[in-house]
């Protein structure tokens, strides 16, 4: 089926996103120039330019030039806060050849700008970016010139940029993890954890945090390629190869679309279809089949088999554009149905119920661009060897890098994907909703080809917060009710509509826990639960043996890190639980007291700091064992356990 006009809703989404999917180019006639060298940065208002790292952040650039101390050491967090209040500029020069400028099209592609950025090319304003979570594709052929070209990006302070919204809002949102008296984080589509959390450093940075490229094309380009699984049996996989193709030329274009498929080095199988591309965006659907498909399996069940798919656009016997994906053939359902005990909540993979064993994942570093490919590989090796099969990407961080989802595919790890909203109500004015729509469009399209992606979740704990965290007492009734109306617009209307439009085969829940139970016994039989009776409620570890949910999507207990880690941020003279340095790395206001309270129940409190740290780690392990074993013992009533949390973003 060929749709030469395209659906209005899809076109609207593309215009909102201004987005291009991150993809691998190979064996085609396009040319990709990576702009990751020659960058300089400067504090706005000064003329001191220094070499910059791209992708990168202004904090890391300042650290590299010894203009900031190591933010993770001692109490240095206090010494870096001035950066968030300043504007910063980045610039580079690159060369365009006469041959490149003869191409039919040139696109400047930013995969990530953090966050408020004005982009200039040769002095012309191309873009005013305002969302960290989307990529931007800008046609630039008319702005380019033969020889040297100048690219300049002006980053506005995310603090000063959002102060006018705060001042006109009339109240301070209850975003208490934002470590500032004015809670500005909710106004920006920017990683919430960067403003601080009850385990995290505050480092509100700016920068070009994902790759920048210029792409030159002739005739046509592929802006999206979705391999949609229609039906799967042991005998046959029926697929639809859905492409969004841009005919760059001002006239109809005769072309051939070729779909290539191979498996583990086997001979490539191809199907082709002749098409006429109208000028502009064309939507093309080409059916294909895989006989005797080898299914993608989760970790512990078998091999996570992946097929290689590529789509090529051929004009006059020349491949002018190509996109490729690795595709896992499988079925995944989130079974959420009424039963004799309440409401089930479990993953069914390839028709078989699966007990979820895993954890909640937060960003691996306070400075995201410091996470190397090697760190991603180590993370997933550890996840696999720990016999996990599910990771929840928590909603206070970021939509992860492509490498994360590729490794999840390769290691058989299902991904529970939150949208990036956590622990506070958010605005719902038209401008904010438009940004969120662009964000949802971009990331659903970017991630939907991954076999590992199991589900979408609207937010972390926001409905629970609205119901149980005292907002009804702390805000006037009209504001409190507006928070609920805003919740409905975001999480019951906008986001599920985008999932249905762009990724209809995946399950969406509006929040986790979706019943908003806050550990109440009457709701343990319904859906997923966050049980913080242990820790905040000071209930015993033994209570986890009996406080049983259908699916435990969060529970946990804090400890200090190992002494090896403590030695990276504290000197021996700081080795006291309540020292200034240790308190700076304890972000929970009740953390030290609760660790001591629980320790007193089962152990003699050690006097020596190193012993206290060690016993605290044992204590944490003891508590987690109670929960993990209880959840596994009680299946199929309980069908999953995800502890909080898998990792840290700094030494804390």
Locate predicted features:
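Alpha-helical scaffolding within the catalytic cores
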Residues: 339-345, 401-403, 438-446
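Substrate-binding clefts and catalytic carboxylate motifs of secreted carbohydrate-active enzymes
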Residues: 31-34, 40-48, 53, 193, ...
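Hydrophobic faces of well-ordered beta-strands that scaffold small-molecule active sites
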Residues: 357-359, 391-393, 415-417, 551-553, ...
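Loop/turn elements at helix/coil->beta-strand transitions in domains of secreted/extracellular proteins
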Residues: 148, 354, 386-391, 409-414, ...
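Active-site neighborhood of glycoside hydrolase catalytic domains
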Residues: 410, 427-519
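Secreted/periplasmic carbohydrate-active enzymes, especially glycoside hydrolases
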Residues: 1-7, 11-390, 630-634, 638
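Aromatic-lined substrate-binding rim segments of carbohydrate-active enzymes
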Residues: 390-434, 527-529, 535-538
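Flexible loop/turn segments at secondary-structure boundaries
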Residues: 115-117, 160-161, 204, 335, ...
């Amino acid at each position: 089926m060929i749709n030469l006009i395209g659906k209005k809703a899809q076109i609207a989404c593309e215009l909102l996103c201004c987005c291009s999917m991150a993809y691998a180019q190979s064996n085609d006639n396009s040319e990709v120039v990576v702009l990751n060298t020659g960058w300089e940065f400067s504090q706005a208002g000064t003329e001191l330019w220094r070499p910059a790292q791209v992708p990168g952040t202004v904090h890391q650039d300042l650290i590299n030039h010894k203009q900031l101390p190591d933010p993770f050491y001692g109490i240095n967090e206090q010494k870096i806060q001035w950066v968030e209040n300043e504007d910063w500029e980045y610039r580079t020069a690159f060369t365009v050849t006469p041959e490149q400028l003869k191409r039919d099209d040139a696109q400047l592609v930013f995969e990530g700008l953090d966050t408020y950025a004005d982009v200039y090319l040769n002095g012309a304003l191309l873009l005013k970016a305002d969302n960290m979570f989307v990529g931007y594709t800008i046609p630039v052929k008319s702005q380019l010139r033969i020889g040297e070209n100048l690219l300049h990006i002006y980053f506005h302070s995310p603090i000063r940029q959002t102060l006018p919204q705060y001042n006109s809002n009339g109240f301070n949102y209850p975003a208490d993890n934002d470590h500032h008296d004015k809670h500005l984080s909710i106004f920006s589509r920017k990683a919430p954890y960067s403003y601080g959390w009850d385990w995290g450093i505050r480092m509100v940075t700016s920068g070009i945090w994902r790759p920048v490229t210029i792409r030159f094309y002739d005739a046509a380009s592929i802006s999206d390629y979705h391999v949609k699984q229609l039906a799967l049996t042991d005998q046959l996989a029926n697929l639809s190869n859905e492409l969004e193709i841009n005919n760059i030329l001002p006239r109809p274009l005769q072309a051939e679309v070729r779909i290539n498929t191979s498996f583990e080095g086997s001979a490539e199988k191809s199907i082709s279809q002749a098409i006429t591309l109208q000028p502009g965006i064309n939507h093309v659907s080409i059916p294909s089949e895989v006989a005797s498909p080898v299914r993608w399996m989760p970790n512990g069940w078998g091999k996570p088999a992946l097929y290689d798919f590529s789509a090529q656009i051929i004009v006059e016997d020349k491949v002018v554009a190509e996109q490729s994906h690795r595709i896992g053939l499988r079925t995944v359902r989130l079974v959420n149905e009424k039963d004799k005990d309440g409401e089930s909540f479990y993953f069914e993979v390839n028709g078989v119920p699966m007990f979820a064993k895993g954890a909640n994942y937060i960003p691996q570093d306070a400075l995201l661009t410091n996470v190397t490919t090697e760190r991603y590989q180590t993370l997933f090796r550890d996840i696999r060897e720990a016999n996990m099969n599910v990771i929840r990407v928590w909603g206070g961080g970021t939509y992860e890098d492509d490498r994360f989802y590729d490794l999840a595919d390769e290691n058989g790890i299902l991904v529970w994907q939150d949208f990036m909203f956590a622990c506070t109500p958010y605005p719902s004015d038209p401008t904010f909703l438009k940004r969120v729509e662009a964000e949802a469009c971009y990331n659903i399209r970017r991630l939907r080809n991954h076999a590992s992606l199991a589900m979408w979740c609207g937010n972390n704990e926001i409905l629970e917060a609205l119901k149980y965290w005292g907002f009804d007492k702390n805000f006037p009734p009209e504001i409190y009710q507006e928070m609920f109306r805003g919740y409905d617009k975001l999480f019951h209307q906008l986001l599920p509509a985008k999932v249905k439009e762009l990724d209809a085969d995946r399950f969406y829940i509006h929040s986790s826990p979706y019943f908003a139970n806050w550990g109440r016994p009457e709701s343990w039989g319904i859906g997923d639960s966050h049980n913080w009776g242990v820790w905040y409620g000071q209930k015993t570890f033994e209570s986890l043996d009996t406080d049983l949910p259908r699916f435990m999507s969060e529970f946990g207990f804090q400890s200090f890190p190992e002494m090896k880690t403590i030695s990276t941020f504290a000197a021996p003279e700081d080795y006291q639980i309540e020292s200034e340095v240790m308190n700076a790395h304890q972000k929970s206001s009740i953390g030290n007291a609760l660790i001591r309270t629980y320790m007193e129940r089962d152990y003699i409190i050690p006097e020596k700091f190193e012993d206290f740290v060690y016993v605290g780690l044992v204590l944490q392990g003891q508590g987690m064992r109670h929960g993990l074993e209880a959840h596994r013992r009680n299946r199929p009533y309980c069908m999953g356990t995800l502890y909080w949390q898998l990792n840290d973003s700094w030494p804390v």
